[in-house]
Amino acid sequence: MNSIEFPLRDRTTQNSVISTTLNELSNWSRLSSLWPLLYGTSCCFIEFASLIGSRFDFDRYGLVPRSSPRQADLILTAGTVTMKMAPSLVRLYEQMPEPKYVIAIGACTITGGMFSTDSYSTVRGVDKLIPVDVYLPGCPPKPEAVIDAITKLRKKISREIYEKQIRSQRENKNRFFTTNHKFHVGRSTQTGNYDQGFFFQPPSTSEISLTHFSNIKKRVQYPPTK
């Protein structure tokens, strides 16, 4: 079972039908099946390697390490990142399909660590290269902290999915044609507040009053007749 409490609308409804899209279904299933790409360079990555053992058993969280960035949706950076390694890290991140997430593990990845004071080739924070979703400080952080960071990322993904659904419902737009046969995209009109500008139609010649026509006729200056 998924340990993340996904905010369902009604848990007590029986014999109900849930309608969704294929994209939302894949996002929901991603909560328990994150495929990480391991980018480790130093001692912090050794702490993450201990999660593979039977004591922590990170397989129960659905984590399946991938060797190709095209098959991963999460990249775990651990250790010092140098200037020469920066282009390869950016390329790996760009090759990952959307949506993609980043967890920065350890002080060296987050701020440069002890190498940031007197090193000319150390990147002072991996967030200067790629966007980071979860920061995990420590030198090195414990395996329990890594599991907690992954749990926080899963909660963040669940909130993003739910907020996206609410936002799409609030910004529900309807497509319709006006009386002038013009196509418009507007918000939902279930509230009864209609935009009268959509229903404006220029009057035809049969609807022009005689007084309006006479005023226009007076303004027109005809050339003098001989």
From Swiss-Prot:
Cofactor binding annotation: Binds 1 [4Fe-4S] cluster.
Principal location listed in the UniProt entry: plastid
NCBIfam families for the chain: nuoB_fam, PRK06411.1
Cofactor: [4Fe-4S] cluster
GO CC annotation terms, alphabetical: chloroplast thylakoid membrane; respiratory chain complex I
Positions bound to [4Fe-4S] cluster: C43, C44, C108, C139
Chain's role: NDH shuttles electrons from NAD(P)H:plastoquinone, via FMN and iron-sulfur (Fe-S) centers, to quinones in the photosynthetic chain and possibly in a chloroplast respiratory chain. The immediate electron acceptor for the enzyme in this species is believed to be plastoquinone. Couples the redox reaction to proton translocation, and thus conserves the redox energy in a proton gradient.
EC class name: translocase
BP GO terms, sorted: aerobic respiration; electron transport coupled proton transport; photosynthesis, light reaction
GO MF annotations, alphabetized: 4 iron, 4 sulfur cluster binding; iron ion binding; NADH dehydrogenase (ubiquinone) activity; quinone binding
Protein's recorded name: NAD(P)H-quinone oxidoreductase subunit K, chloroplastic
SUPFAM superfamilies: HydA/Nqo6-like
Record's subunit section: NDH is composed of at least 16 different subunits, 5 of which are encoded in the nucleus.
E.C. numbers: 7.1.1.-
Family per record: Belongs to the complex I 20 kDa subunit family.
Localization (cell): Plastid, Chloroplast thylakoid membrane
Keywords of the record: 4Fe-4S, Chloroplast, Iron, Iron-sulfur, Membrane, Metal-binding, NAD, NADP, Plastid, Plastoquinone, Quinone, Thylakoid, Translocase, Transport
Transmembrane segments: none
Bilayer topology annotation: Peripheral membrane protein
Cited InterPro entries: NADH_UbQ_OxRdtase-like_20kDa, NADH_UQ_OxRdtase_20Kd_su
Catalyzed reactions per annotation: a plastoquinone + NADH + (n+1) H(+)(in) = a plastoquinol + NAD(+) + n H(+)(out); a plastoquinone + NADPH + (n+1) H(+)(in) = a plastoquinol + NADP(+) + n H(+)(out)
